[in-house]
Amino acid sequence: MDFNLSREHQLIRKMMAEFTEKEVKPIAAETDRTCEYPRENIEKLFDLGVMGMCVPKEYGGAGADPLASAICIEELSKQCASTGDIVATHNGLCCDPIMTYGTPEQKAKYLPMLTKGHHVGAFALTEPNAGSDASKGQTEAKLVGAHYVMNGSKIFITNGYVADVFVVFAMTDKTRGTKGISAFIVESGFPGFSVGKHEEKLGLHGSPTAEIVFQDCIVPKENLLGVEGKGFSIAMATLDGGRIGIAAQSLGIAEGALAEAINYTKGRVQFGKPISKFQNTQFTLADMELGCEAGRLLTYQAAIAKGEGKRYTKLAAMAKLFTSEHAMKTTTKVVQLFGGYGYTKDYPVERMMRDAKITEIYEGTSEVQRIVISANMGL
């Protein structure tokens, strides 16, 4: 087995590392402070072909594989997890299901919008009473003539107040449980669509999270994604892929924090020598490095399996679980290594710690990942 990246993937990493250093890092702290969506950088990522990069070339994408997308998200998240989150949602949760389940007409219309058209995508599943138990959603879509009439609301929607295209899940038959859920492609300009509360969050301040509301929202019949009653299976399969994106984001956060820790501990002198020379510090940093290497192997393995068309549900859950928990542990320990300085905004590590927490929650909590893993072990 060859663990080395291909020449193409190495070039993608180099390109994204340079972009992150030049464009993302200089504004990361300000993005966090102002809670502003990094619009200019997202436009540049569209120009670079990163947004929607796995979309086939015939629809305006780069035709890249899931590993390439994971590498991009990882590199971006080393300096700004918000930017990594925006890309992960667009690529994995909006472009992906349209590519996989869309009709030829839907692909021809929406995929070019989500690539060369610079339209941002989002995924709308979570509701106030339907979080980990996504089957309990109350949003409804009733077929009336040539269109569906959608009513309800979704919460905690990443890209919520900037997105143009949403993959939305709604009940089309309440008597059938999960088999009564259907998926739709909804545009922000459809009559009856509106954006509700903008969430104020612990971290990911540059990632636009909002409630979206459907009040007699008119959705054309041809915007049904897949067939009626298949929405829940579409959502679960899409989340499998999305978890690879969050694993890559988590990995990037941990790697970014570790790099900050190495640099700081080499320069911080206490008791007559750099604190990097103390064995306790060395062991702590060694454990962080070990976790990053293991997390990278899991994440890349899941991405490669997805790209090869293999079953990857368990791999994605393991990658997401391991890297998210490692990111939280690493950033917490890095803040401790920085001491009082780590608690201030003079250094980025407190932001990294705040950003890391959500990775243990969204796209399935750590507890849900353990359920998925054990279920795929035949337990």
List the predicted regions and their residue ranges.
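Short Ser/Thr-interspersed hydrophobic loop/turn segments at strand-loop and sheet-helix junctions
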Residues: 49, 73-77, 170, 186-191, ...
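Short glycine/proline-enriched turns and hinge-like loops at secondary-structure junctions
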Residues: 64-65, 133-135, 159-164, 177-180, ...
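A short, Trp-centered hydrophobic/proline-enriched beta-strand micro-motif
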Residues: 117-125
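Conserved hydrophobic/aromatic beta-strand scaffold that supports enzyme active sites
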Residues: 122, 138-140, 147, 165-169, ...
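A short core secondary-structure module
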Residues: 147, 151-195
